[in-house]
């Protein structure tokens, strides 16, 4: 989640230039996902129907991957806006799920809350580090997008594996 967020933040100026946005317009266009994320937090707080439903979490992971890729490859403003709706909603669902399950699903709330925060730190550091390494190694301006997308895809596979193992064992 935070790997994708920080990669988008780093690539936003180039993406804005690609679709012809000036600095002010870029700030407005690229802030949409923050507003969607805030709305999604409120919705998830008020509606408990998503609790302990694997499909919601998996949809958040897959949706984050898809919206991330669309956002980074968008060639027009409407597509940038549409992809941010998905990205904002999915990033909120994943963040809220992580925190909720860390705090609600165990007796050691503070320990699991600390693990949640540590994983955020890994994403904040790891996304830009992986992105920089990918661009340095390949020289391609899109290498950061594909490297982080690979990590997100691996996360989808890992979560599916864990879910399957938990159901069968």
Question: Whereabouts are the PLM-identified features?
Answer:
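Intracellular juxtamembrane helix-capping segments at the cytosolic ends
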Residues: 92-107
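A membrane-interface helix-boundary motif in multi-pass transporters
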Residues: 133-152
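Multi-pass alpha-helical transporter architecture, strongest
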Residues: 72, 146-169
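A late C-terminal transmembrane helix in Major Facilitator Superfamily
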Residues: 109-137
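Paired small-residue
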Residues: 78-86
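Helix-to-loop junctions at the C-terminal end of transmembrane segments
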Residues: 39-53, 135-136
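Short amphipathic helix-loop junctions that connect adjacent transmembrane helices
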Residues: 10-26, 104
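Structural signature of the two symmetry-related core transmembrane helices
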Residues: 55-70, 149
